[in-house]
Amino acid sequence: MAKPFFSLQKFLRRAQFFLFFLTVAYLMAGSLLLLQRSYLVIQQSNRGTVGNLGLSADSVGDQYIDHRMVPKGLAKLHAKNLLTQRHGVIDQPLWLITRNSELRQLRRRWFHNFVKDQDPSLGTPSKVVKHMLVNKGTYVGCFVDNAEKRTLKATVFFDLRKMTVSHCQDACAERTYVYAGLAYGSECYCGNHLPLNRAKEEECNNECKGEKGSVCGGVNRLSVFRLEDLHVSAKQRRNVTYRGCFRAPENVTRIFPVSFPNLTVEMCSEFCSDKEYPLAIVKWTECFCGYPTGQFNLYEPLDESLCAGYLNGTNESEALREENYCSVYQTPIQDTRCTDRKFLPIKSKVFIALSSFPGAGNTWVRHLIEHATGYYTGSYYFDGTLYNKGFKGEKDHWRSGRTICVKTHESGKREIEMYDSSILLIRNPYKALIAEFNRKCGGHLGYATEKHWTSREWPEFVNSYASWWASHALDWLQYGRKLLVVHYEDLKMDLIGKLREMLAFLKVPINEDRLLCVENNKDGNFKRLGSSQSSLEPFTQEMKNVIDGYIRTVDKALKARNFSGLPEEYMPR
């Protein structure tokens, strides 16, 4: 009897130790889990939520997260120059992670800028902010903003981070407008006519994004300023561009809605600017104002000497007077027939890539496509600078289906096969490398300094990026399902013709007025003005030898896919 009792007692003692260890293990596991959860909560609170980023919950799921790669191996082409360095996963949201450092930095910059700029007033009752005293211009009042019948429509631009009253006034005055209007805290509208309907002052209650305490309109409301003093001083620096000599249409008075006799070129340009027309047409001493049309499209300029008589007042001009020649000038007025854009009304199930190597003109082509189609373009990345300048599709997830096409610099089989069709934009690698290095050092509109060009950074940049230019094109030629190849240089030479090809590829109906408007405003707001100050030749002979080898290989690959080869200017001399 005693033996079974001691056996039971021994078992219970062992069971106690066993339960004790189980309890300790359970508590330790629970503590670790609690600490991990607390860490994630703190991490999310510091970075913002998916909702703050404008992404759906699905957009951060496995089905949308792909590990990005620098272009894969470039066979037989200086493999040692390829970007094959692996980057470890750092502590940040998954959608920020990419193996290409440039793209990762781009996403990280957008992420931090966007989180920083979240409006703390969202969800709180609106309050009236007092108008600050403004030295430039005179505040007129709060007016109703009707998007369909907008009065201040001559020039429209956005700045969702840094819009101020002075910024809008200066921009409108520079273009010689009389009135500047601000809405939604970030939108600026210019024009020469005051809106018709006034609104209550308290309805203009949106604080300017870049200036605390000042008012920049409201929802469908404009804070309007008169720029009379600035307008007078701006006339001295009026930005009028000579477009060329053209043959005037036969029914000139019917095509151009406004005309005035006996005006000089300067007077005609000022007259048409005041009437808010983008073109001033001078035929002898007659002045006409209007837009490019199908009958007068500015596609075929004539020899300058044919219009010289008008300007010089020579005897020859008497003979020319009987001919239908005219001189055309671009006024500061923006052609607004193609500035309205929107998201696709029905989500598309077809994903079309607008693919290019960085520096190949992707942003410029997006500007052309958006204004020609009227629909926003999307992006595989999130560039806050572009979003703040009006590329509203930049914020949408690339698979939202609401944009006409999606910008990408990615390559590799997996990344390319995610798209149903693609527009491959190719630019001369010498020009593309310089453009991307300028963007990297000076931003979208700036230039690298001479110090940058002579530093070690430039050779390292060429060593890495030159091979990427080649492998990017080769990968898309190999894995792209349905491909349209567009050369940047061809687009510059034949803008309308190449735009028609792209619109047909995108299956978008062609609107002739929008195309004429695009041609009239083809540069947009992302063209680098002037030229780089550096006169140095940035490419060494060794660099040229490597790049020329890449050019020959891409040219051969294009012809193998039955595309025309690279333009002659690419080819090594």
Swiss-Prot record:
<feature type="domain" description="WSC 2">
    <location>
        <begin position="239"/>
        <end position="332"/>
    </location>
</feature>
<dbReference type="GO" id="GO:0008146">
    <property type="term" value="F:sulfotransferase activity"/>
</dbReference>
<keyword id="KW-0812">Transmembrane</keyword>
<feature type="topological domain" description="Cytoplasmic">
    <location>
        <begin position="1"/>
        <end position="14"/>
    </location>
</feature>
<feature type="glycosylation site" description="N-linked (GlcNAc...) asparagine">
    <location>
        <position position="315"/>
    </location>
</feature>
<feature type="domain" description="WSC 1">
    <location>
        <begin position="136"/>
        <end position="228"/>
    </location>
</feature>
<dbReference type="InterPro" id="IPR002889">
    <property type="entry name" value="WSC_carb-bd"/>
</dbReference>
<feature type="topological domain" description="Extracellular">
    <location>
        <begin position="36"/>
        <end position="573"/>
    </location>
</feature>
<keyword id="KW-0735">Signal-anchor</keyword>
<dbReference type="Pfam" id="PF01822">
    <property type="entry name" value="WSC"/>
</dbReference>
<feature type="glycosylation site" description="N-linked (GlcNAc...) asparagine">
    <location>
        <position position="562"/>
    </location>
</feature>
<dbReference type="GO" id="GO:0000139">
    <property type="term" value="C:Golgi membrane"/>
</dbReference>
<feature type="glycosylation site" description="N-linked (GlcNAc...) asparagine">
    <location>
        <position position="239"/>
    </location>
</feature>
<keyword id="KW-0333">Golgi apparatus</keyword>
<protein>
    <recommendedName>
        <fullName>Sialate:O-sulfotransferase 1</fullName>
    </recommendedName>
</protein>
<comment type="function">
    <text>Sialate:O-sulfotransferase which catalyzes 8-O-sulfation at the Sia-glycan level using 3'-phosphoadenosine 5'-phosphosulfate (PAPS) as a donor, forming 8-O-sulfated Sia (Sia8S)-glycans.</text>
</comment>
<dbReference type="InterPro" id="IPR051589">
    <property type="entry name" value="Sialate-O-sulfotransferase"/>
</dbReference>
<keyword id="KW-1133">Transmembrane helix</keyword>
<feature type="transmembrane region" description="Helical; Signal-anchor for type II membrane protein">
    <location>
        <begin position="15"/>
        <end position="35"/>
    </location>
</feature>
<dbReference type="Pfam" id="PF00685">
    <property type="entry name" value="Sulfotransfer_1"/>
</dbReference>
<feature type="glycosylation site" description="N-linked (GlcNAc...) asparagine">
    <location>
        <position position="251"/>
    </location>
</feature>
<comment type="similarity">
    <text>Belongs to the WSCD family.</text>
</comment>
<feature type="glycosylation site" description="N-linked (GlcNAc...) asparagine">
    <location>
        <position position="262"/>
    </location>
</feature>
<feature type="glycosylation site" description="N-linked (GlcNAc...) asparagine">
    <location>
        <position position="312"/>
    </location>
</feature>
<keyword id="KW-0325">Glycoprotein</keyword>
<dbReference type="InterPro" id="IPR000863">
    <property type="entry name" value="Sulfotransferase_dom"/>
</dbReference>
<keyword id="KW-0677">Repeat</keyword>
<keyword id="KW-0472">Membrane</keyword>
<dbReference type="InterPro" id="IPR027417">
    <property type="entry name" value="P-loop_NTPase"/>
</dbReference>
